[in-house]
Amino acid sequence: GGSSRKSLVASRVSLDAAVKGADANSASALSSELFFVADVLSTNIAVRRALTDPSRDGKAKAAFISELFGKKVGGVALGLVTELSSLRWSAPKDLVLVLEQLAIEAEASAANIAGELDRVEDEIFTAAAAFASSTDLRKALTSDATNAKATLVADILKGASGSTVKLVS
């Protein structure tokens, strides 16, 4: 919806400010932390609703976020998540989708800072082509066997950039 689109735009501005001047490792760490928060929110509807409820006080949300994630993510990620919780969302799941998008963009920024963005783009394209051309690969990737999927992706991406592995996984 319209609220989530506006919030996505505001979120990207905040992410750009967060990665401006950062080194590749810091941008990649931010990506990992945003993926972590998105994963927690994707599996916990109550937390997701608490963070997207427009009737909840911003200070209460910030305290909740700090309590929940303060020891698990860095200050930059904590600040971004707090800021995102203050925005309007058309649906609670939109916050998760935007967090995942920001995590991808942070990892792309890390690759760009490291001078590897073209390589990462090529590797992702090659991996996507491999997945698209193989029914067996697609079946393996859609199975519930997480360890088997991780091993398969690692085998396919052997020698690939760390950013590529993170983004494809």
Regions found by a protein language model. Give the residues of each.
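Elongated, mostly alpha-helical coiled-coil "stalk/stator" tethers of large membrane protein machines
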Residues: 1-169
